[in-house]
Amino acid sequence: LAVTKKRIQPDTSAPTKRIALGDIRRLKSVGRREYNNVIYNGCKDYEKRCKMTLDDYMNKHFPDLMLCPPLFYSWEIGIRFELGNPPMFRIDKQQYMEQVYDRAISIYKYLHKESDEIFVVTNAHFADEPNLIRRKPKVYRRYITNKEVLKGLKHKVIPYVFADVYGIDDFETHRFILKCFGRDIKYMSMIKAICNNDVAIKPKIYHDVFFVNFTTGTIFHVYDDRGCDVVSNSKTALMNLYRDYNEWILNYDRSRIDQTLGSNFTEGSHSI
């Protein structure tokens, strides 16, 4: 059987309005202006982000927080994780360090993406050493892949961050700041070197290194092979981390962390 297509007749009951060519041009012009405004404003925002310094960012998002350990006890919203199991260190040092590396790298990967903008901040503590300003710490020379990015490395001398703790006045803290993307960091080998700080394993990084994630609003710091701190200016930014790595939370501080982040957490829902 031959099938004939039925022609759909236009609805003539509703009045139609003819759009003039000039109206079309005006609509296109308005759309173009709106599009250009979006692009312009986006570029302005990006330019502001590029020009924002670490101090600008910290003053805006982490007011009164000093970038020095212990971060967890200096900020309201945070998690302290246990990396190494102390009894295991005496039994099997290699197995102990493998757990330390695995946990530290897993948490770092969870928090940082390749496209994230990150301040890599290093605190080096010395007595007066004028030649230090001419040297890039190994933190940057070894573990930053993009050598062009290294040209943006900033150096400043600030008062010794532990002066109140140790009562030492003749030391000063040399702070190095590099703004880069997550993809520029050899994070696996870098995290391992940070974890090696207090154990007889090389390579090691002696200085405090902080990963200030400009994109997500988190700060990550491994204080040694025992543990690491993650703080944020938003509870939302840490909820998934709290849920998925709940078993790694340091029990000593668990009650405080649960009180801060546990209200939206269902027991038994965590997984690693």
Language-model region placement:
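Alpha-helical oligomerization segments
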Residues: 211-272
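Short amphipathic alpha-helix segments
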Residues: 200-209
